[in-house]
């Protein structure tokens, strides 16, 4: 089956993102296809390059990046939610006159259209 995941919780302080990542790995291990992960609302914090967890904590941001690198899963974050929360790529930093970007490599700023497209092309969309 083809899946898409929507994550609405931050990397730390809530369970949604961690559960979503575990679910993603379970899908792939069972031979399912994971088309994309869409990060919305507080979920956009999963794409913050500047996140620095304590040494004894799991690095969820880099784990999402590894999922993208190893399995080619698209990691889309809602551009409107990201801008409101200070997550920007180089293009937006230039456009807004900000000194630098902080979007973790492997993540892409996108609109809700990416979620709609995934909904149309997948068998299941699961929200965390």
UniProtKB/Swiss-Prot annotation:
Pfam families, sorted: DsrE (PF02635)
EC number: 2.8.1.-
Active site as annotated: 78 (cysteine persulfide intermediate)
UniProt entry keywords in alphabetical sequence: Cytoplasm, Transferase, tRNA processing
GO biological process: tRNA wobble position uridine thiolation
Record flagged with keyword tRNA processing: yes
Main location as per UniProt: cytoplasm
GO terms of molecular function: sulfur carrier activity; sulfurtransferase activity
Classification via Gene3D superfamilies: DsrEFH-like
Compartment list: Cytoplasm
Superkingdom of source: Bacteria
Cellular component terms (Gene Ontology): sulfurtransferase complex
Subunit structure as annotated in this protein's UniProt entry: Heterohexamer, formed by a dimer of trimers. The hexameric TusBCD complex contains 2 copies each of TusB, TusC and TusD. The TusBCD complex interacts with TusE.
NCBIfam families, alphabetized: PRK00207.1, sulf_tusD_dsrE
Protein function: Part of a sulfur-relay system required for 2-thiolation of 5-methylaminomethyl-2-thiouridine (mnm(5)s(2)U) at tRNA wobble positions. Accepts sulfur from TusA and transfers it in turn to TusE.
Record-stated family: Belongs to the DsrE/TusD family.
Protein name per the record: Sulfurtransferase TusD
Native source organism of the sequence: Salmonella arizonae (strain ATCC BAA-731 / CDC346-86 / RSK2980)
Gene for this chain: tusD
């Amino acid at each position: 089956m083809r899946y898409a995941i929507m994550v609405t919780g931050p990397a730390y302080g809530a369970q949604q993102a961690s559960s979503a990542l575990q679910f993603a790995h379970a899908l792939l291990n069972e031979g399912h296809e994971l088309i994309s992960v869409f990060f919305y609302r507080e979920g956009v914090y999963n794409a913050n390059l500047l996140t620095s967890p304590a040494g004894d904590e799991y690095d969820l941001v880099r784990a999402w990046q590894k999922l993208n690198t190893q399995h080619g899963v698209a990691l889309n974050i809602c551009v409107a939610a990201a801008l409101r929360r200070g997550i920007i790529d180089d293009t937006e930093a230039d456009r807004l006159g900000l000194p630098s970007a902080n979007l973790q490599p492997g993540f892409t700023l996108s609109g809700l259209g990416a979620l709609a497209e995934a909904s149309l092309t997948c068998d299941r969309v699961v929200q965390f």
